[in-house]
């Protein structure tokens, strides 16, 4: 090969390499531009149209780093849409309950600014659990805490914090309320907030931080709601509300709410005689509630809600080991599934239970007459067999010589099943502890477990002699 041929060959090879490099740079440029614009668009599987990502509610942003010939390209993948919760998974099989959370609010109030509260509850969005309570518009170490034993004042507000975070001064006040319920439909929070005069109260429905709807008192006698979480299935949330006598016939309605708007109202039907302060849980495809009969029964009413056709049925828990306080002793108490037992039916306390096949798990105060101690157990046949009394898997949550209070249920969706959890209100102060002028609470929370567990007692634990008066 002569010199001219060598020059031509080298030139041809160089030109070929340069052309390849040029084409590669064009490809990189096209890829970069394409990815840059595609991060703001998602393919719609329904009609193959392009939809903007920005207005869509998302669960998370995912960023992938792609390396091409020393060029770094950031590609944002469009996140999946957030869907309504449907709670269609089965209920978890459990052997009992394990400790989950305790906020120690009263003990912390001895040396810090903590809200005075009562009527606490717990509810979870798809990723995190929150604790709620009705604040009294004051901290404990504050003269405004005097006489906070009263339930209904215009200063009461619904407080919301992450579970385990006491209600400190930075706590969000969600709404004005002396009775409330909250739940998350998979996209946003719904808060039902009742406030106003006893004879003409208003319930406000706040969805995604906005007031969407309201309803006024229909019986002019203390409109009130659950004091625990409501339940949403496929975008329809249900809440049980009562207006009328606390010791006689009252008017209970079940409201169906979609994104904060009341879409239907159903009257209570079935054999339940008096229904208040329901503890509700998803029982796909419907909702089931265990409530308080403050008139005739120490056995707890059951309210079954059909979300699809808005129909309602009601009855009573079959277990002869009844769940309300006050009640007869276990040898004398009874329940026959359909009607109130007419045993120490006046007064009562908010509580919970849930079905497990033919059996029932339940919690109650250990004392038959006062809000002292707390226990849980399973009653074999307690859901289906009248007056069943075979108790197993009993656990003490709070010893009998320590104070308890309201309790309620909340549900947590896992990978394969829905777990049931409960909270116990630990009331301190007046009326029983007259050294101080305030009434407030802390909480303890347990969740169902399929594992083993030990024993203990988890009272409030504050020394009343160390507390502000």
Swiss-Prot record:
The chain crosses the membrane at residues 10-30. Residues 1-9 are intravirion. Residues 11-33 are annotated as: Involved in apical transport and lipid raft association. It catalyses: Hydrolysis of alpha-(2->3)-, alpha-(2->6)-, alpha-(2->8)- glycosidic linkages of terminal sialic acid residues in oligosaccharides, glycoproteins, glycolipids, colominic acid and synthetic substrates. Residues 31-469 are virion surface. Keywords: Calcium, Disulfide bond, Glycoprotein, Glycosidase, Host cell membrane, Host membrane, Hydrolase, Membrane, Metal-binding, Signal-anchor, Transmembrane, Transmembrane helix, Virion. It is a single-pass type II membrane protein. Residues 36-88 are annotated as: Hypervariable stalk region. It is found in: Virion membrane; Host apical cell membrane. InterPro entries: Glyco_hydro_34 (IPR001860), Sialidase_Influenza_A/B (IPR033654), Sialidase_sf (IPR036278). One of its GO terms (molecular function) is metal ion binding. GO terms for cellular component: host cell plasma membrane; membrane; virion membrane. Its main location: virion. Homotetramer. Catalyzes the removal of terminal sialic acid residues from viral and cellular glycoconjugates. Cleaves off the terminal sialic acids on the glycosylated HA during virus budding to facilitate virus release. Additionally helps virus spread through the circulation by further removing sialic acids from the cell surface. These cleavages prevent self-aggregation and ensure the efficient spread of the progeny virus from cell to cell. Otherwise, infection would be limited to one round of replication. This is Neuraminidase. It comes from Influenza A virus (strain A/Swine/Hong Kong/4/1976 H3N2). The lineage of its organism: Viruses, Riboviria, Orthornavirae, Negarnaviricota, Polyploviricotina.
């Amino acid at each position: 090969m002569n010199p001219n041929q060598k020059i031509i060959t080298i030139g041809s090879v160089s030109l070929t390499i340069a052309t390849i490099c040029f084409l590669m740079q064009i490809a990189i440029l096209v890829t970069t531009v394409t990815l840059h614009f595609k991060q703001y668009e998602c393919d719609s599987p329904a009609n193959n149209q392009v939809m903007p990502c920005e207005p869509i509610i998302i669960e998370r942003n995912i960023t992938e780093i792609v390396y091409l010939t020393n060029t770094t390209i950031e590609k944002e993948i469009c996140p999946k849409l957030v869907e309504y919760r449907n709670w269609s998974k089965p209920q978890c099989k459990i052997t009992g309950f394990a400790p989950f959370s305790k906020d120690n609010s009263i003990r912390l109030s001895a040396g810090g600014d903590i809200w005075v509260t009562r009527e606490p509850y717990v509810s979870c969005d798809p990723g995190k659990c929150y604790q709620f309570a009705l604040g009294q518009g004051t901290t404990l170490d504050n003269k405004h805490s005097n006489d906070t034993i009263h339930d209904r004042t215009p200063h009461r507000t619904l407080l919301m914090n992450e579970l385990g975070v006491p209600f400190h001064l930075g706590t969000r006040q969600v709404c004005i309320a002396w009775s409330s319920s909250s739940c998350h439909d998979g996209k946003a929070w719904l808060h039902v907030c009742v406030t106003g005069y006893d004879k003409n109260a208003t319930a406000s429905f706040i969805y995604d931080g906005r007031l969407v709807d309201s309803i006024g008192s229909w019986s002019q006698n203390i409109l009130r709601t659950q004091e625990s979480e409501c339940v949403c299935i496929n975008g329809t949330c249900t809440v049980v509300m009562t207006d009328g006598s606390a010791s006689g016939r009252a008017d209970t309605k079940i409201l169906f709410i979609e994104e904060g708007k009341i879409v239907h109202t159903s009257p209570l039907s079935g054999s339940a005689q008096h229904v208040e302060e329901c503890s509700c849980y998803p029982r796909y495809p419907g909702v089931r509630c265990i409530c308080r009969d403050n008139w005739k029964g120490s056995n707890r009413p059951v309210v079954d809600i059909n979300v699809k056709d808005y129909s309602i049925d009601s009855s009573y828990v079959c277990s002869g080991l009844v769940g309300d306080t006050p009640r007869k002793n276990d040898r004398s108490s009874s329940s026959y599934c359909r009607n109130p037992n007419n045993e120490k039916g006046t007064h009562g306390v908010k509580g919970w239970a849930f079905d497990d096949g033919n059996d029932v798990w339940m919690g109650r105060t250990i004392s038959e007459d006062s809000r002292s101690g707390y226990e849980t157990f399973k009653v074999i046949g307690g859901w289906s067999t009248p007056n069943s009394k075979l108790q197993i898997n009993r656990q003490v949550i709070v010893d009998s010589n320590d104070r308890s209070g309201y309790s309620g249920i909340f549900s947590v969706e896992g990978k394969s099943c829905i777990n049931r959890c409960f909270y116990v209100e630990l009331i301190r102060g007046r009326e029983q502890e007259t050294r101080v002028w305030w009434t407030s609470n802390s909480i303890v929370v347990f969740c169902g477990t399929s594992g083993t567990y030990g024993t203990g007692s988890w009272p409030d634990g504050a020394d009343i002699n160390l507390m502000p008066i």
